[in-house]
Amino acid sequence: MSVIIRTMTIADYDGVSSLWLSIKGFAIRSIDDSREGVDVFLKRNPTTSVVAEDNGVIIGSILCGHDGRRGTLYHVCVAQGYRNHGIGKAMVVKAMEALEAEHVSNVTLIAFT
């Protein structure tokens, strides 16, 4: 396993969308989570969303954005076979560092169980 944690771009959308669809019960909204919706989100927040990649395959993702004051982590997920290896934590750390670089210190996590 050779996992890379990096900033998400719209080029990652197909892999991220496939990951979302692979997770049972994952809440996807057709407008917000469409390619167009995610593109708008990433353009507004170009440095804060994160993916985890193993040999070119997206195995984790976080949509992360802020309004200048508060940050929010959305769609935090790791593929089933990659869980319990610290990948989720590493992605959260990278997203939090990106928020800190933009002087955002209040963060909310949106989670569905």
Predicted segments, located by residue:
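Residues forming the Rossmann-fold NAD(P)(H) cofactor-binding site
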Residues: 85, 89, 93
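Glycine-rich beta-to-alpha transition loops that act as phosphate-gripper elements at the mouths
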Residues: 32, 112-113
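A short, internal acetyl-CoA/4′-phosphopantetheine-binding micro-motif in the GNAT/acyltransferase core
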Residues: 76-83, 111-112
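Conserved GNAT acetyl-CoA-binding A-motif
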Residues: 99-111
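Acetyl-CoA-dependent GNAT
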Residues: 3, 7-75, 79, 92-94, ...
